[in-house]
Amino acid sequence: MKLLKILSLVCLSISIGACAEHSMSRAKTSTIPQVNNSIIDQNVQALFNEISADAVFVTYDGQNIKKYGTHLDRAKTAYIPASTFKIANALIGLENHKATSTEIFKWDGKPRFFKAWDKDFTLGEAMQASTVPVYQELARRIGPSLMQSELQRIGYGNMQIGTEVDQFWLKGPLTITPIQEVKFVYDLAQGQLPFKPEVQQQVKEMLYVERRGENRLYAKSGWGMAVDPQVGWYVGFVEKADGQVVAFALNMQMKAGDDIALRKQLSLDVLDKLGVFHYL
């Protein structure tokens, strides 16, 4: 009888010890990602602290929305899309046969806002150079009625185009939030927008920026100069080697004279710190 009691006490002691060790192990493993995430957040925040601008950087991996920056409320605030609307414009135009991906849009010989725009472009080339007149011509071909119905069909932003079919994304009334932007480009990356698969693939290829290892970056910039305060965008997604897609949207207040390359550079720096698109 005494032997049974001794054995019972030994087993109980071992069981308690094992449970305590398991609890300590769980506590240790659960704190590691929290520390890492905290360090990552601090490193990203340091990037935004270096710039004197209201800004937010939003990421979306198909499940989670994350926000970084100096003014996180901008993530849910609507702004004109500026040239990031070229993505939707191209999708609508190609889907409705208003242009092809190989068509040459001829320059009319008149000086444009940037001298680099004074030449012929395909839609893809105009996407890369952000050539506004080419996409204004595409919008005029689409026309106000079709443009309005298409924006409603795909649920783009506030779906308002007003009376000027070649100005509404530059001056308003069309607006979109950074969260809406990341979800839109995420669906494009996955081929899940309500457009033909081949159309989505064509537009996706127009957005290609660079490759690092097996990871690929696709993006479009935007600068709304016709509104006050001015707004800057850098919107896109990274396709990682394992097939994961991470969409992102930088939205920031800008002013005349700001560095035109800041939006892209800041986005690349943030993506690097987040471990999404590392510098090699």
Swiss-Prot record:
**Modification note:** Carboxylated on the epsilon-amino group of a lysine, with the resulting carbamate functional group serving as a general base. Probably N-carboxylated at Lys-86 at neutral pH in vivo and undergoes complete N-decarboxylation, at pH 4.1, in vitro. N-carboxylation at Lys-86 probably increases catalytic activity under physiological conditions.
Cite the EC number. 3.5.2.6
Which BP terms in the Gene Ontology apply to this protein? antibiotic catabolic process; cell wall organization; response to antibiotic
Impact noted for substituting F113Y: Similar catalytic efficiency to wild-type with respect to penicillins, oxacillin and imipenem
Active-site residue list: S83
Q: Which Gene Ontology cellular component annotation is one that this UniProt entry carries?
A: plasma membrane
Q: What is the effect of changing S83A?
A: Reduces catalytic activity about 500-fold with respect to nitrocefin. Slightly reduces thermal stability
- Result of changing W169A: Reduces catalytic activity about 5-fold with respect to nitrocefin. Reduces thermal stability
Q: How is its activity regulated?
A: Activated approximately 3-fold by the presence of 0.1M NaHCO3.
Check the UniProt entry and state the signal peptide residues, or none: 1-18
Cell membrane recorded as keyword: yes
Q: Does the keyword DNA repair feature in the UniProt annotation?
A: no
Tell what triggers its expression: Expressed from an upstream promoter, P(Aba2), in an insertion sequence, ISAba2. Expression level is positively correlated with gene copy-number in clinical isolates.
Q: Which domain of life is it from?
A: Bacteria
Query: Lipidated positions for S-diacylglycerol cysteine?
Result: C19
Where is this protein localized, as stated in its record? Cell membrane
* NCBIfam families tied to this protein: bla_class_D_main, blaOXA-58_like
The family annotation for this protein states: Belongs to the class-D beta-lactamase family.
Its assembly, as annotated, is: Monomer. Dimer.
Q: What does this protein do?
A: Class D beta-lactamase which confers resistance to the beta-lactam antibiotics, including penicillins and oxacillin, and moderate resistance to carbapenems such as imipenem; in the DH10B strain of E.coli. Acts via hydrolysis of the beta-lactam ring. Has benzylpenicillin-, oxacillin-, cephalothin- and imipenem-hydrolyzing activities.
The name this protein carries in UniProt is Beta-lactamase OXA-58
